[in-house]
Design a protein with these regions (language model features):
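Short acidic/glycine-enriched loop/turn segments that link adjacent beta-strands
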Residues: 63-65
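Amphipathic, hydrophobic secondary-structure cores in small proteins
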Residues: 7-58
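Right-handed parallel beta-helix/beta-solenoid
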Residues: 1-6
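Core SAM-dependent methyltransferase catalytic element
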Residues: 67-73
């Protein structure tokens, strides 16, 4: 099952903190789709995934927003 988190309008570190909380609730291998328009997320989200042991599956642009698919490690 894929879970979604819309963090549009939130500035870092809030998108990463909310993603961390949501990922903790998922089983290993679970998917989270994170949407954010924070420009700092381009650096923060991949760094968070690498540090926390999660796998960044996809990264895409949608207008002013970025959409990340993260698989829980």
């Amino acid at each position: 099952m894929t879970h979604e988190l819309d963090a549009t309008g939130l500035l870092c570190p809030l998108p990463v903190l909310k993603a961390r909380k949501r990922l903790r609730a998922l089983e290993p291998g679970g998917l989270l789709v994170l949407r954010t328009d924070d420009p700092a997320a381009i650096i923060d989200v991949p760094h968070f995934c690498a540090e926390a042991g999660h796998h960044l599956e996809t990264q895409a642009e949608d207008g002013n927003a970025m959409i990340w698919t993260i698989r829980r490690g």
